[in-house]
Amino acid sequence: MKEHLNALQQLAVDSAEDKKAFDILILDLRNRSDLTDFFMICSGNSNVHVQSIVDAILDKCYQNRNKPLAVEGYSGGIWVVVDLGD
């Protein structure tokens, strides 16, 4: 999977893996949706774990000057959507 990812996707996957996310999946929606090109879906063991995965992804994005457009659902930690824009 990794050989087909762009830099931003790889950053998100690596950040999630560093925080022990599991079931990481990249969905290519370029030919199916006008709303988005890709989804990354992953899982965590708890609300706190999910939040730490998101924190790691956001930290790496900010370090690489990729400011997320939106983050939804973070406070609950059950699900989180992060729009990385690119």
Please provide the spans of the model-predicted regions.
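Short hydrophobic/aromatic beta-strand micro-patches
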Residues: 41-44
